[in-house]
Structures are given as C-alpha cells and as structure tokens.
C-alpha cells in the first residue's frame, strides 16, 4: 500500500478548513513539532498563515499580509480584541496572554511605543516563528515570557504588578486551557488590573461552555460587555473593568476619537459599540468553573 506523508494530509486539511483559501494555490514554507503542537506556516496569494494542530486535534489559523508595510489585521475576531481601547485609550502597561503570530502586540506597540508590554507564551517555538515569519519584533519596552500564564499571573500578583490593558488570548478556536477559565484564575487576573484597567477576553460565542463561562466571569467581574460580530459566529470578546463600565454614548465618543489611529489596521472601531451588550443571554444559574470543576475539554 502506498504511504502518504502525514504533513501532506495535514496541509490538505488546513487548506480545507481555512476559507476562503484553496488547496492548489497554497505553499508550506515551514513545519515544526513543538512540545505542545504541530506548527505549519504556509502562504496563499498575498497572505502568510500560521496553523496549530495540538495533541488533542484542535486547530487554529492566523494570517497576516506578506507585505510588512501592510498593517491590516486579517481576521475580524483578532481585530475585535482592540475594542479594549474604547475603555482605556492610553494604556501604559499591557499584558497579553498568548502570542500567536503577534498581530495584536505589533499593533499595540506601534500605537503606544512608550508603553510597557508583557507577553506570555507557553510555546517557545511560537515565539521564534512569530519573529521569523510574521515580522514580530519585540521593542525595548516589550518582554516575551516563556511559560504558563497561570504561573506568570500568580507571580505578578505577588509582586503587586498592575496593568491598564489585559488581553486573555490563549484561545485557539476550539479550546482554551481549562486552568485559564476558572474563577480562581480570573480572581488572580482581576488583581492585576489597575484602577482604570480593562480586561479583554477572546473566547467562544457558541458552545456548551458558554453558560458556565459567562456565569463565571459575572461572578468575578460583575457586569461585563459581551461583544459579538454577527458574521463571526464562533467568537466573542468579553470586556470588563474594576470601575463602572462606560455607557454606549461614551463608548461611541471614544470610538470616534480612535477611528483615525486604527484605520491602518482595518479596525472599524466606530461600529463596535453598537455590537456590545450588557444583557445576560446565558443561564445565570449555570455552575461556575472552578479549579475543582472545570470540564472545559468536555463542554466545548
């Protein structure tokens, strides 16, 4: 029987999953196994894409334009995370959990060159690939920490560190590490917020986990904005603060002030406030996710 290279099979599957790209016009330029996942970098027309295949079979794709002068962020769900700037438009200290191709850190570094940024990425291979293939270049104000985010956040809390913008982006499209979803973890993260800081979480909009996750965030942060883009049916962004949340009018005014600065990244920030809601659309009696009860893998 003829044997088939598993990388070829993987590539074919990736091309099938990554709409609107087609199989025949894509080229693998790098593939590598890490301790956590198989990583493939491939090109299609004017895009370069990063795909992960984890040990349990989950997959995620992120793409950037090959032209380093083209700052546009390709995927809407990635652009959505910059909605946090509506709540704190001048963050001086930024914490990002999950690097990927580095689109968001690169955008924030350009927007706020004097701000200090800490990025936590568990997989050192991802950091290497982001720099080699996706133009991610940490500035003198940016530090990439290799390790588990839960450990980093716990240690940062013990040191009394505070951040104005915290992005939880350890989301790969189908899976978030379950120890990064519990009430205990969110309490530890909440302690890192500055008095005017914003928490931004990129997560699911539809799954069996939705009710449990929403109830858990509500138990820790109280009221939060639920931000969904209709055509992005699989994603949502949760936004919350320690202080009372701004109303829709204040968000719209801030969006107008940010529109020009965010245009190069294809972020239509002026459309975001109307897509945010404070209304609960989940079972408010759902059991909270805790370190003792966090079946995230089963509920996805």
Swiss-Prot record:
Domain PABS stretches: 7-253
Protein name: Polyamine aminopropyltransferase
KW ATP-binding (keyword) present: no
Gene coding for it: speE
A GO term for molecular function: spermidine synthase activity
Active site, per annotation: 169
Family: Belongs to the spermidine/spermine synthase family.
Keywords attached to this entry: Cytoplasm, Polyamine biosynthesis, Spermidine biosynthesis, Transferase
E.C. no: 2.5.1.16
Enzyme class per UniProt: transferase
UniProt superkingdom: Bacteria
């Amino acid at each position: 029987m003829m044997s088939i290279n598993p990388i070829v099979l993987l590539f074919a599957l990736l091309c099938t999953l990554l709409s609107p790209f087609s199989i025949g016009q894509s080229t693998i330029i790098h593939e590598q196994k890490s301790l956590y996942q198989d990583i493939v970098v491939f090109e299609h027309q004017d895009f370069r894409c990063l795909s992960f295949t984890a040990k349990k079979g989950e997959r995620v794709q992120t793409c950037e334009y090959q032209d380093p002068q083209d700052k546009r962020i390709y995927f809407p769900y990635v652009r959505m995370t910059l909605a946090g700037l509506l709540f704190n438009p001048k963050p001086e200290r930024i914490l990002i959990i999950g690097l990927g191709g580095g689109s968001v850190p690169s955008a924030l570094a350009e927007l706020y060159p004097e701000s200090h940024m800490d990025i936590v990425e568990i997989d050192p291979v991802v950091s290497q690939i982001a720099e080699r293939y996706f133009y991610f270049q940490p500035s003198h104000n940016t530090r990439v920490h290799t390790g588990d985010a839960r450990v980093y956040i716990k240690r940062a809390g013990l040191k009394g560190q505070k951040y104005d913008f915290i992005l939880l982006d350890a989301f790969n499209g189908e899976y978030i590490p379950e120890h990064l979803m519990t009430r205990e973890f969110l309490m530890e993260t909440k302690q890192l917020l500055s008095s005017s800081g914003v928490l931004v979480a990129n997560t699911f909009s539809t799954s069996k986990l939705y009710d449990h996750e929403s109830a858990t965030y509500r138990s820790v942060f109280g009221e939060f904005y639920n931000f969904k883009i209709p055509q992005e049916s699989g994603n949502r962004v949760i936004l919350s603060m320690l202080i009372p949340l701004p109303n829709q009018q204040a968000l719209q005014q801030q969006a107008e002030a940010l529109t020009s600065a965010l245009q190069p990244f294809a972020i239509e920030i002026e459309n975001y406030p109307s897509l945010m809601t404070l209304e609960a659309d989940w079972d408010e009696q759902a059991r909270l996710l805790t370190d003792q009860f966090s079946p995230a893998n089963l509920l996805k």
